[in-house]
């Protein structure tokens, strides 16, 4: 199932957002309830290429944005997707801020019938780090409160906390992990995903301020290994296996489609190529492949 852009507006202005500002300026009519239902019904009938991202992936669906929770018909839309996709895992990608409203969070908990998940982005251990990345003062407090409400009100919800790693967040990663362990000590209740940022949309526009090479991020990951080991379920996205320590390689996942990845010549000599992401195509264009080293068994 595809990634579905539920709504094109957002209440954050994240410096590394993969959308361009032009996305938010589109006519929102194409994202309203009636239009969303029509698109899904056409998709289910196999009537052409309806969704652009991951249209051929089976087994799950991601509800993305913008910020999906801002959709004026958010709850009717959730009910529709759950009814038309029974038994299919659905994941809501959100900044979590609207869940700071306890009534809203409770209503979501009732509507998000399993299998259902929420992937909430956290940009740091405090407002000083998180808010400048989110582009909104007060965002950190609302996101953390939103997470608290989801933990309390939605026991059947699969909660994932996503930390996007770039120049503005990488140094704070150990502190962010410590914050999570202290604030939400039952790590069996949620998963954590550390994602090396993708170079597209606003992250490309803001390349000077967010650009991060694997050589830098891998050093911080290695230092954070004792903290990483304390989480029941922690994963790494978008990392070539040769760029992380051997202890971290089992945590790496390949989540990008083949057309968004490349295997430079050095990869042909690598013993773990088949299990590896390679390089993100846009990363390769921006930074090249000099960092890569073939792993020998």
Language-model-derived ranges and their functions:
Residues 1-3, 49-57, 247-254:
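N-terminal [4Fe-4S]-dependent radical SAM core
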Residues 1-42:
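Canonical Radical SAM [4Fe-4S] cluster-binding loop centered on the CxxxCxxC motif
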Residues 41-62, 71-171, 181-192:
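Radical SAM/AdoMet-radical enzyme domain recognition
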Residues 65-66:
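Active-site beta-strand/loop signature of hydrolases that rely on acidic residues for catalysis
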């Amino acid at each position: 199932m595809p990634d579905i852009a539920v709504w094109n507006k957002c209440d954050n202005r994240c410096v590394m957002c993969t959308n361009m500002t032009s996305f938010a300026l589109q006519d929102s009519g194409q994202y309203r309830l009636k239009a969303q239902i029509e698109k899904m019904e056409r998709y289910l009938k196999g009537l052409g290429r309806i969704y652009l991202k991951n249209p051929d992936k089976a087994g799950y669906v991601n509800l993305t944005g913008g910020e999906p929770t801002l959709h004026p018909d958010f709850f009717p839309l959730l009910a529709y997707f759950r009814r038309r996709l029974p038994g299919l895992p659905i994941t809501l990608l959100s900044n979590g801020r609207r869940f700071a409203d306890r009534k809203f969070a409770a209503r979501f908990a009732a509507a998000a019938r399993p299998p259902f998940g929420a992937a909430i982005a956290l940009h740091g251990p405090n407002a000083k780090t998180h808010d400048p990345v989110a582009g909104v003062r007060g965002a950190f407090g609302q996101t953390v409160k939103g997470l608290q409400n989801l933990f309390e009100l939605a026991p059947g919800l699969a909660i994932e906390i996503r930390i996007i790693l770039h120049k503005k967040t990488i140094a704070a990663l150990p502190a962010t992990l410590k914050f999570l362990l202290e604030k939400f000590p039952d790590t069996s209740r949620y998963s954590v995903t550390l994602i090396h940022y993708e170079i597209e949309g606003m992250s490309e526009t803001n390349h000077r301020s967010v650009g991060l090479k694997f050589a830098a991020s891998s050093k911080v990951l290695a230092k954070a290994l004792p903290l990483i080991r304390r989480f029941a379920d922690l994963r790494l996205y978008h990392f070539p296996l040769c760029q992380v320590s051997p202890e971290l390689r089992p945590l790496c996942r390949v989540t990008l489609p083949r057309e968004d990845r490349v295997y430079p010549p050095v990869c042909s000599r690598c013993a773990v190529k088949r299990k590896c992401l390679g390089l993100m195509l846009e990363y390769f264009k921006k930074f090249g492949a000099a960092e890569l080293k073939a792993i020998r068994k």
